[in-house]
């Protein structure tokens, strides 16, 4: 699996993910890019789960963004509806984290679209470790969103065998 972290702080939203691709207990690749920009660079998206499934979901989500003129929540809800009702999609094993200047969301294969209260998303195999680290850093430091995302992923990578330290980070100003 992998670990994805997204943090909103000090006028920025940051999403970061590690680069490990595993097949069972074997590391197949260490430098995969699991965080990318969508919809003319206005949306940051990351995935945890099966890589091929995630690419399918990225394509479907980007199509929904185009259809709904970049409206993040509407596109996420429509993707989640499709995911629940389309038989081929319902078998996909991946989760998406998406963020723009207005919101940060988790989209699951169960049809859930969740906007965390504190603007913090952590998911994947190392998600609980990254979330604990990021939450502590948010509460007890004045670090930037980027520093929190990067540090929490490094901590998750130290603990979770399915998370490495090859990190991809995307950052966006909330004022854009």
From Swiss-Prot:
Query: Which molecular-function annotations from GO does this UniProt entry contain?
Result: metal ion binding; threonine-type endopeptidase activity
Q: How is its activity regulated?
A: Allosterically activated by HslU binding.
Query: Can you supply one Gene Ontology CC term for this chain's record?
Result: HslUV protease complex
Catalytic activity annotation: ATP-dependent cleavage of peptide bonds with broad specificity
InterPro entries named in the record: ATP-dep_Prtase_HsIV_su (IPR022281), Ntn_hydrolases_N (IPR029055), Proteasome_sua/b (IPR001353), Proteasome_suB-type (IPR023333)
Q: Does the keyword Hydrolase apply?
A: yes
User: Residues in the active site?
Assistant: 2
Where Na(+) is bound, by residue?
157, 160, 163
* Subcellular location(s) per record: Cytoplasm
Question: What EC number(s) does the entry state?
Answer: 3.4.25.2
Q: Which GO annotations describe the biological process of this protein? A: proteolysis involved in protein catabolic process
Domain of life according to the entry: Bacteria
- UniProt enzyme class: hydrolase
* Cysteine pairs bridged by disulfides in the record: none
Per its database record, what is this protein's job? Protease subunit of a proteasome-like degradation complex believed to be a general protein degrading machinery.
Homology family: Belongs to the peptidase T1B family. HslV subfamily.
Quaternary structure per UniProt? A double ring-shaped homohexamer of HslV is capped on each side by a ring-shaped HslU homohexamer. The assembly of the HslU/HslV complex is dependent on binding of ATP.
Q: What is the recorded name of this protein? A: ATP-dependent protease subunit HslV
Which organism does this record belong to?
Answer: Pseudomonas syringae pv. tomato (strain ATCC BAA-871 / DC3000)
- Organism classification, top ranks? Bacteria, Pseudomonadati, Pseudomonadota, Gammaproteobacteria, Pseudomonadales
